[in-house]
Amino acid sequence: MRTTFMANEANIERKWLVVDAEGQRLGRLASEVASILRGKHKATYTPHADTGDNVIIINADKIELTGNKINDKMYYRHSNHPGGLKERNAYEMRTKYPEQMLEIAVKGMLPKGPLGRKMGKKLHVYRGAEHNHQAQKPEVYELRG
């Protein structure tokens, strides 16, 4: 007789959580959000199943970086054409694309593969304090740090 609980799609209850990024450090916020997306904050966590909650991050443009990372940290992408390497520093990313900056940080902390991509789809990042998920009745989540 098996007594260990194994979560599957039929018995998972997902909540919607709102996290305010204002004044938070990028890495600390990203690691906690990645843990929520994986479902590690629940007693029903199962490594091979997607048990995590949906997370809405607001005020992404007010995220903080310590030290001189705002000028030194670089984000790279490539067009797959010769000489197609593009780079931006963290200051440009925070002013122009703060949503991408947070998505890159969080998704880099999720598992690689199909399950990790499925978990990443439950992340919703917004630049300001407004989001369009009021119908899901999200709860405010206070970060531990």
From Swiss-Prot:
Per its UniProt entry, which superkingdom is the organism in? Bacteria
Q: Name one GO molecular function term.
A: structural constituent of ribosome
Question: Does Isomerase count among this protein's keywords?
Answer: no
InterPro entries, from UniProt? Ribosomal_uL13 (IPR005822), Ribosomal_uL13_bac-type (IPR005823), Ribosomal_uL13_CS (IPR023563), Ribosomal_uL13_sf (IPR036899)
Instruction: Tell me if Amino-acid biosynthesis is a UniProt keyword of this record.
Output: no
UniProt xrefs under NCBIfam families? rplM_bact (TIGR01066)
A GO cellular-component term linked to this record: cytosolic large ribosomal subunit
Q: Could you give the subunit structure recorded for this chain?
A: Part of the 50S ribosomal subunit.
Q: Which organism is it from?
A: Oceanobacillus iheyensis (strain DSM 14371 / CIP 107618 / JCM 11309 / KCTC 3954 / HTE831)
GO BP annotations listed: negative regulation of translation; translation
Keyword annotations of the record: Ribonucleoprotein, Ribosomal protein
Similarity comment text for this entry: Belongs to the universal ribosomal protein uL13 family.
Name of the molecule in the record: Large ribosomal subunit protein uL13
Q: Which gene encodes it?
A: rplM
Q: Which Pfam families match?
A: Ribosomal_L13
Entry function: This protein is one of the early assembly proteins of the 50S ribosomal subunit, although it is not seen to bind rRNA by itself. It is important during the early stages of 50S assembly.
